[in-house]
Amino acid sequence: TGIEWTPIGSTVNEDGEVEHCFSGKFYGNGYTISNLDFSENYGKTEYPSFGFFSEVHGAEISGLTIQGNLDVSNSEYVFFGTVAGVAVDSKISDCVSNVSFTDTDKYINGTVALCGYAINSTIEYCQNKGNFSVMKDTSQFWMGGIVGLAENSTVQYCVNTGDMTSWTPSSGGIVGFLTKSSKVINCYSTGKIVPLGKGTTDFGGIAGTVGAGTEIRHCYFAGEMDLSQYTATPPYKRLGGIAGGVSSDTPVFENNYFVKTENVPACFKYQDAGTEKTLDFMKTEDFFNEITAAGGNYRFNSNGTPILPAPKYSVSFVVTPAELTNVIIKVGGQVATNPADLEAGTYQVEVSADNCEVFNSNITITADTATHTHTIAMTYLPADYTKVDTAIGKVNALNKDEYKDFTKVEEAVNAVVRGKNITEQTEVEAMAKAIEDAIAALEYKDADYSKVDAAIAKAEALNKNEYKDFT
């Protein structure tokens, strides 16, 4: 048995309303929280939203793996998500769920997924490995590998490898119910699908049900469809390789593919929602080229179907001062755009600009959004003081006692301010000119004629007639 889990962010008042939710940042840094048992507290009235986190609002969760199990023992309405029951205005990224969900005989309502109910949120680079099984018919239940019910949300770069056995109204490999302009972009599912019942529920390889303004683009389903317990009459109207059902007539489908299964369309109402392929073909380089040429972002996998790219984050560089020209940013030795899409890791950054010293530093990128913006304060090149130093050299060579007034020269020298940068070169040139002008304005003192006058006085005191030659 696992450890009974009380969810984070689960304070509920007497009216059943969540008073306190998690609104911070949680970075798992790649660690796994294992051996969790969600069974005991599932369905309790104090946990209408349930998971590792109960409800998150304006939160960021990343780098976390959840491992555990849930065997349903209560029949209350529960938004269950292994990572978060409900996510509002939040971002969940780079998380992995490996939690099994089993309901054999309880009449349940709500959700099961990595994130149960996503509202105005983004879920990206996440994976579900857990198997989900709901063996009993339900009235309101949404099962998805990544999101159960998505409302005004985006699910992108996610994968489901877990198997799904379902009799729920809306079940999908990635999202159970996609509604209110939500999007599924560049996701795939390889888990086995086992639909139950007579074909009165929606089950899709990517989404169970799609609604108004929703989009599914660049996705593929490459899992097995086990129809051994499905008693609907073909052609199947609510079972699809891409989407099971459509609740509104305005969804958008682009560049989607699904594995060929007899009598199973991409979507009964939108036959062109996806293109049928054999599983063998989907493992070839030709298929990789086909899906990527049309806009899909995948990596070729020689051992199977295409896989997702490594997580990338949009990293912005704020270079100051803002008025700099010819700014060039290099990341890892390569010229980069701004913002730049970077994988997690440490990079050497070099920034150059006109009249500035070259900036060099290392930056570390993680899922933490605080690492996605870097302010770089550039340092201007120093001003050229050559003319100032030359002028001061001239001053030092002078004997100030030879001049009537040396004050202006000394004032000009004392007015020199060191440490100016190249944008202040004009001021430095003015300092040099002030010194040169002061030197040019110097006036020598009058010569001392006292000895001359004394000698003349002696000469005038003589009687030249007393001398042979007074010339």
Question: Where would I find each of the regions flagged by the language model?
Answer:
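Beta-rich interaction/scaffold domains
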Residues: 313-324, 352-372, 377-471
